[in-house]
């Protein structure tokens, strides 16, 4: 099992169907500092990210590990991984290729609470998935 130099609270964000713990991961553009997405990761996903430099997450809906952009081509190259003060959330500082959101938007945070769209759609999801 992968060991890290800091204590991480896997399980703070729930568990997989197999009982593996999850941590919340925020992906942020390393240059613009725009918040791109929130996802979850298992210990294995974090280890793969640290080893490969490519963002890996855990899909709770599909119950599987996934590499960002493996299907769509909208990849995240991870420049740095930061840990929050409680060790139960991570921040991936990334170089984003294409949009981060499966809806085709640059960021998953492309709507206001009033329902207004505030972000650009940078690709057609029908062409990517």
Curated annotation (Swiss-Prot):
Gene Ontology BP terms: L-histidine biosynthetic process
Record-listed Mg(2+) binding positions: 84, 86, 88
EC number, as in UniProt: 3.5.4.19
SUPFAM superfamilies in UniProt: HisI-like
Pathway(s) per entry: Amino-acid biosynthesis; L-histidine biosynthesis; L-histidine from 5-phospho-alpha-D-ribose 1-diphosphate: step 3/9
GO CC annotation: cytoplasm
Cofactor, how bound (note): Binds 1 Mg(2+) ion per subunit.
Positions with a binding annotation for Zn(2+): 85, 101, 108
Subcellular location per the Swiss-Prot or TrEMBL entry: Cytoplasm
Cofactor: Mg(2+); Zn(2+)
Pfam families (UniProt xref): PRA-CH
Keywords on record: Amino-acid biosynthesis, Cytoplasm, Histidine biosynthesis, Hydrolase, Magnesium, Metal-binding, Zinc
Parts of the chain that traverse the membrane: none
Principal location class: cytoplasm
InterPro entries: PRA-CH (IPR026660), PRib_AMP_CycHydrolase_dom (IPR002496), PRib_AMP_CycHydrolase_sf (IPR038019)
Catalytic activities: 1-(5-phospho-beta-D-ribosyl)-5'-AMP + H2O = 1-(5-phospho-beta-D-ribosyl)-5-[(5-phospho-beta-D-ribosylamino)methylideneamino]imidazole-4-carboxamide
PANTHER family cross-referenced by the UniProt entry: HISTIDINE BIOSYNTHESIS BIFUNCTIONAL PROTEIN (PTHR42945), HISTIDINE BIOSYNTHESIS BIFUNCTIONAL PROTEIN HIS7 (PTHR42945:SF1)
Protein role: Catalyzes the hydrolysis of the adenine ring of phosphoribosyl-AMP.
HAMAP family: HisI (MF_01021)
Similarity-based family: Belongs to the PRA-CH family.
Entry protein name: Phosphoribosyl-AMP cyclohydrolase
Organism per entry: Halobacterium salinarum (strain ATCC 700922 / JCM 11081 / NRC-1)
């Amino acid at each position: 099992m992968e060991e890290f130099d800091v204590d991480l609270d896997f399980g703070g964000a729930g568990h997989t169907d197999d009982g593996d713990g999850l941590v919340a991961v925020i992906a942020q553009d390393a240059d613009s500092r725009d918040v791109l997405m929130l996802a979850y990761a298992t210990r294995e996903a974090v280890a793969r990210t640290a080893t490969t430099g490519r963002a890996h997450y855990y899909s709770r809906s599909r119950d599987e590990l996934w590499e960002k952009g493996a299907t769509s081509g909208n990849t995240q190259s991870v420049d740095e991984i930061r840990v929050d003060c409680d060790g139960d959330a991570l921040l991936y500082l990334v170089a984003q290729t294409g949009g981060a959101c499966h809806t085709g938007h640059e960021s998953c945070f492309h709507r206001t609470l009033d329902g207004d769209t505030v972000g650009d759609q940078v690709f057609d999801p029908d062409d990517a998935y």
